[in-house]
Amino acid sequence: MRETLEALSSLGFSVGQPEMAPQSEPREGSHNAQEQMSSSREERALGVCSGHEAPTPEEGAHTEQAEAPCRGQACSAQKAQPVGTCPGEEWMIRKVKVEDEDQEAEEEVEWPQHLSLLPSPFPAPDLGHLAAAYKLEPGAPGALSGLALSGWGPMPEKPYGCGECERRFRDQLTLRLHQRLHRGEGPCACPDCGRSFTQRAHMLLHQRSHRGERPFPCSECDKRFSKKAHLTRHLRTHTGERPYPCAECGKRFSQKIHLGSHQKTHTGERPFPCTECEKRFRKKTHLIRHQRIHTGERPYQCAQCARSFTHKQHLVRHQRVHQTAGPARPSPDSSASPHSTAPSPTPSFPGPKPFACSDCGLSFGWKKNLATHQCLHRSEGRPFGCDECALGATVDAPAAKPLASAPGGPGCGPGSDPVVPQRAPSGERSFFCPDCGRGFSHGQHLARHPRVHTGERPFACTQCDRRFGSRPNLVAHSRAHSGARPFACAQCGRRFSRKSHLGRHQAVHTGSRPHACAVCARSFSSKTNLVRHQAIHTGSRPFSCPQCGKSFSRKTHLVRHQLIHGEAAHAAPDAALAAPAWSAPPEVAPPPLFF
């Protein structure tokens, strides 16, 4: 009781003597209130009591003084109660004791001297807005609720990468959980394909691909998507947004995964090696496409002609051939008639040409052909020039023609027309020779072909005196001097100097004879053997001896015959040893071509 009176006196209240209070139930109630206060802190915070009698007039003064500091506070509701329900002395005792204990608790909170805070082996959490609120700088020691935050530094963004795919993670635990999906150990597996997922919601989204459900349509085009994230990513193609810039070169990308793949070009990282050869790749998709070369897999098949492709983009380009009818192929004997009109050597792409040049309006079926054509309009012009003439220098846009209209084909000289190398769809032959009607799939091949008729051989071997009409033939011939045989057979290990020779040899193991004669139905493993065989039916002997005039159906027979005259091999003029111009009589149908 003395402590209570001293506390009231320290607050500026005038407190009477204890004997002034009546020795009745209020004193006992006051004593009971003190016992309840010491038993529980919750009862001290209530500040409401009941069951006491009204104070005497002498105590009224004390009650008014006790109520004075409560005006406008939480105990204002107690004033509306009848007098005597909550004695002011008891309330003041509780109020003072609670405030004193809270103040003492705040003063006693100190970090013990015998304890120290050690750095945790786990990575520091991302404080985010807490770091800004408490003014904690990354990597610098700080204080949060009395605990020293020392040793916390900025972590790498995603230091742990998955070896199976290109995803990266911030901690090893998440990486291990992700790797379980590659092993098929996820808790949620798709009942249709068996793919594993860590969450059931992800599995439900995946099952839309099996049902064909695409609930998110694009407002700009007709495409629909199974996930909203895919739609958001697709919309960037319409808006042109590229929110992910490269820190090295400033190039921007629409997807974060594309940025990660691009950054490997700066670091030189190629984490995906081929198990069959020594090549390495930056993306796993590139590795999968490359491995089809070793396995021979062609998973993309055309529904109209059953032709297969290794890449999906090759199938898409091929399908343009079927969208519109291609040009009619001229017959081989169309040039025999002097009044027949020679077919135009201008290439015709048998399908839509969606890639148009913005400068001259010329359209192309392939995007890379458009890029090659646009070099004519830019300053670099033709970066690959001829060492012997001016062909290949920078030309103007009007000078760019698909092919030369001269019957002799494009020449090599300052006044010759430039040739834009164009390519027909894979397997199609849209470039035809006006002299013999032979078709080619590439404009450059047609540009080299007239040398067969003119006998021109501009490429000479430095080891011997032989000359060739094309550079690839010269390169293949040079292997005869060096002994290089880079093409090996996987079945028997035999090596060849040319890839075509290897392909011809592999028919021995497979037993394939795709070239059949249209007259006798005899099959051959190579087209060359078929052409030689057809000379039996046509009676053609294109190789004649200049000494005696005897003709032969094969060049090797002519060379062997010339030994009789005492001449060395290959002594005949180049024009006489040119490729034979096979002329089939009208009664013999030309053989079908198999490619």
From Swiss-Prot:
The keyword Metal-binding applies. Residues 325-343 have a biased composition (Low complexity). SMART domains: ZnF_C2H2. Its main location: nucleus. It comes from the Eukaryota. Residues 1-67, 313-350 are annotated as: Disordered. One of its GO terms (molecular function) is RNA polymerase II cis-regulatory region sequence-specific DNA binding. There is a cross-link at K97, K368 (Glycyl lysine isopeptide (Lys-Gly) (interchain with G-Cter in SUMO2)). A zinc finger (C2H2-type) spans 160-182, 188-210, 216-238, 244-266, 272-294, 300-322, 355-377, 431-453, 459-481, 487-509, 515-537, 543-565. GO terms for biological process: regulation of transcription by RNA polymerase II. Transcription factor that promotes adipocyte differentiation and suppresses osteoblast differentiation in the bone marrow. Enhances the osteoclast-supporting ability of stromal cells. Binds with STAT3 the consensus sequence 5'-CTTCTGGGAAGA-3' of the acute phase response element (APRE). Transactivates several promoters including FOS, OSM and PPARG. Recruits a histone deacetylase complex. Belongs to the krueppel C2H2-type zinc-finger protein family. This is Zinc finger protein 467. It comes from Homo sapiens.
